[in-house]
Amino acid sequence: MLSATLFIFCVSWLHVRAETVSTRYGDIEGLVTSYPNVSGPFKSVSKFLGVPFAAPPTGELRFKAPQPPKAWKPKVHSAKTHGSICLQSKLIELFFKPVIMTPNFNYSEDCLYLDIYSPNTSLSLPVMVYIHGGGYIVGGAVTSPSDILALQGVVVVIIQYRLGPFGFLTTGDSAAPGNYGMLDQVQALKWVSENIANFGGNPSKVTIFGQSAGGSSVALHVLSPRSRDFFHQAIAESGVELSSFATQPTSFGLGITKELAQKLNCGSNDHYAMVSCIHNKRASDIQKAAESIRVDHSTYLSWAPVVDKNFLLETPQSLKMKGDFKQIPLIISFTSNEGAMAVGALASDSFGLNESLDDGVSPTFFKTYLAKFAHARDSR
């Protein structure tokens, strides 16, 4: 009862008003939220949610590099709610719904949006651009609300990028080079560089940071000539360019693409014909087929960046040996308790072990889970 009273009291003191900011593509209207501050006056954060940084990657733009968004001038774009998250497994809901209390996740192939949180749009503050993790197959801006970080005096940008086959399908040649999701990230960084000054951010003080696959993405941007001009510092959390999940050989990616093609009745030795057939399938059918692919994740992830001679010119090992990377301040770290949020979902979903972990992991549960996990891996 006390916690409910405190919650109602805090909410009653929130003040919300609209704010409009200009970009190269037109004006954007977001919301300013003021929060109580025990040590002084209210603190405010301007939120601009669901801002398009690229054209919808649908139709002819599926399996293609992102293109800039179309200008919406003289209209004003409403940026008061999150944009749809990219198509992915609904497994994400098991992990995040209990934490962020989002009633519904909206999934769409049209998902190249970013969220901006600014403590003051009239200043020139450092900028932090967050790249979410999720094994290149799940995640989105809605899972990373950043009011608290913005209140520390930085402009925070959360970007989205295509996932799974939509972001990383490859044949190893010009039929499907791959890395569309990484190029989405580059396009988002370019958008930030061109527009963030109007949101109170300094385009000359941009730090990119991310966790897990977001961390490896950050490290790959340090190696990529496509993105080097758009950031100045980097933080890679629980993932770097040499992590086992960071990239995959092109031959492995081609094998996954061929398996996807078989499931969609698109099998062909002609890569162009195969990709064209997949391209013409419904997005929901592609996603469903991709989720049915099973790989041994002790080797590589199903979908991941590859050497495409565009975003990634050579393997990370080769580029590092040559010293061909952006030399900037870099923090590499791990994330404490990063698996804690997933434990409950895994316990109730994996191997039929429906046991509450509210009071911790019992010795019986641990031994049973370990035995079943080992058996599952041995039987692959």
What are these regions (language model features)?
Residues 2-4, 10, 96, 101-271, ...:
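Serine-hydrolase-like catalytic core of hydrolytic proteins
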Residues 4-5, 16:
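Cleavable N-terminal signal peptides
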Residues 10-182, 203, 297-299, 338-339, ...:
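Non-catalytic accessory segments of hydrolases
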Residues 73, 258-295:
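Accessory cap/linker subdomain of secreted extracellular hydrolases
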Residues 241-242, 246, 277-380:
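Substrate-gating cap/lid region and adjacent catalytic-acid/histidine neighborhood
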